[in-house]
């Protein structure tokens, strides 16, 4: 743990960064668990992938650690994924995928 002396504006930015890094990530875990309901695959099957992803940002910038179909522009995989999702899930998948694409051009 590290102590930083910051201005109010910096603390506010740190807080919202924490929401993106932690709160929204936890929502993604919840959504992943929901997607695995009614399968014979437990959420724990994702834990090695989650741990590997988290470990990468200790040595790489988050942008450089980005992987997946949006990063690769793999339209076939993305379209198949969309076919497995509800309308609300599709909207979020598309929004996040587009953000990944924009940041990795």
Model-assigned labels for residue ranges:
Residues 44-105:
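NAD(P)-dependent Rossmann-like dehydrogenase/reductase catalytic/cofactor-binding core
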Residues 1-58:
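Internal alpha-helical scaffold of NAD(P)-dependent oxidoreductase catalytic cores
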């Amino acid at each position: 743990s590290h102590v930083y002396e910051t201005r109010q504006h910096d603390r506010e930015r740190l807080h919202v960064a924490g929401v993106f890094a932690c709160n929204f990530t936890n929502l993604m875990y919840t959504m992943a668990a929901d997607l695995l309901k009614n399968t014979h695959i437990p959420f724990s099957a994702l834990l090695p992938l989650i741990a590997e992803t988290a470990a990468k940002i200790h040595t790489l910038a988050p942008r450089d650690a980005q992987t997946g179909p949006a990063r690769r522009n793999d339209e076939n995989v993305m379209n198949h994924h969309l076919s497995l999702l509800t309308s609300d899930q599709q909207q979020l998948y598309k929004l996040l995928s587009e953000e990944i694409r924009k940041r990795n051009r």
